[in-house]
Amino acid sequence: MSEAERLAAGDPTLFAGSTAATALGWLRHSSAYGGPWLSTIEARLPRRHERTLLVGMGGSSSPARMLSRAPFLTVLDTSNPDTIAATEFDGATLIVASKSGTTVEVQTLMAHALVNGVEPEDLVVITDPGTSLAALGDWLGATVILADPHTGGRFSALSPFGLVPALYAGWSVTELAELQDANQLDAGVVERALARAAAVEIVDGVGQLDVGGDPAANGTALWFEQLIAETTGKDGRGIIPVPGAGPGPGPSEILELHLAAAWLARQLGVDPFNQPDVERAKRDVFVRLMPDARDQSTPVAGVASLGAVLDYPGYHTLQVYGPLSAGEQLAPLRAAVAARCGTTTANLGPRYLHSTGQLHKGGPAVGVIQVVLRPASAPRRIQGRGYTFHDLHRAQADADLAALVSVGRPVARVVADTIDEVLAMVAALG
């Protein structure tokens, strides 16, 4: 068999590492989740409200951002207290999406929503079989939809994680069935994917790929950025997804891009389906949320100055911990850093922890500027927790800062009230 035929057949021995044997379910999603499945699911969904909120991170929410047709669906992929304070939960359907069922942002926002107006009968849970989230959803009387456990989050756009939110985002069953038909696995889509991967120039284990838009403000670019960064960025190698002018890929190219990303990882000799460095900061978050740690607020050691990081000769990334509305404001800041430093990417925290965070810590060396915007809202204690959203948001920033320092990344932190203040700091350093 040729390599293309082996890929179409789902041969796990094509890939480095040991995860492929249980991670190739996405190759059959277009058939498994076609018209009959969509019709059955549509009949189960609660439809009491016009507004729908989706709580999810990484691959559990980025497909929804790509497919969303505003204003039908609002995606809350954050722990930012200002965004949460500004969100009206009463009178909305809530979709809670998490493969593992243990994602901290999802758990805390779900708890918050259920005591701030969301009724269990208006709750839709999307998760893998056997998770604690599935059990909780059943106990609450929510609509629980089980996903494919043999598919990683970033490869789940054509599964329930992408399709169910799309049904709330203006797509009809017929339109989604046609989308699945356009993404059927055949020889043509495999050949196009291999050609797309072959077109990416890779030098010493590093390449760049235009994602066709600004991931901080464009849902399709955000989805594509995660797919490339998390699939390839490990073992010191990786493809850097860079903002582009567009047009980006369309929904009919989802399977082709899944295949191309996996093949790029094969060319780099890395496991396409693991994300070893994503867990690095997650573990430290919970340590920092312990009462003693919150009270001490110990600074992260080893942090560099802004000037030193701007002088770093490699590529740069901006990690901005602020409200979701700040995503629209990142382009001028990214452009200012790029004018001085060259290739620069930017996105919001903690969103990036579930996507490009793998690339930042596991991929090619990068200069990191972490921006923390001071929340304007009053602290809000999370239902059933001993900490607030302010505590969680800052703990996530601190944990990733420490993780970046621990792997030798040059990283600076800037604390400010607005993006304009940060722009002024960059300008002052010439």
Predicted region positions:
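Glycine-rich, charge-decorated loop segments at or immediately adjacent to ligand/cofactor-binding or catalytic sites
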Residues: I126, G130-A142, N347, L353-K361, ...
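Glycine-rich phosphate-binding loops that contact phosphosugars or nucleotide phosphates
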Residues: P46-A187, P247-G248
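Gly/serine-rich nucleotide phosphate-binding loop at the start of the catalytic core
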Residues: M1-D11, P291
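Short, structured coil segments at secondary-structure junctions
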Residues: W139-G141, R340, V407
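Acidic catalytic cores of enzymes that act on phosphate-bearing nucleotides/polynucleotides
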Residues: F15-H49, R65-L67, W171-T174, L185-R280, ...
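Catalytic-loop motifs flanking and including active-site residues across diverse enzymes
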Residues: P63, S156-P160, F224, E256-A260, ...
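C-terminal amphipathic alpha-helical interaction region
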Residues: Y312-P313, T317-L318, A346-P350, H390, ...
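A generic structural motif
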Residues: V75-T78, P120-D128, L146-G152, T231-G246, ...
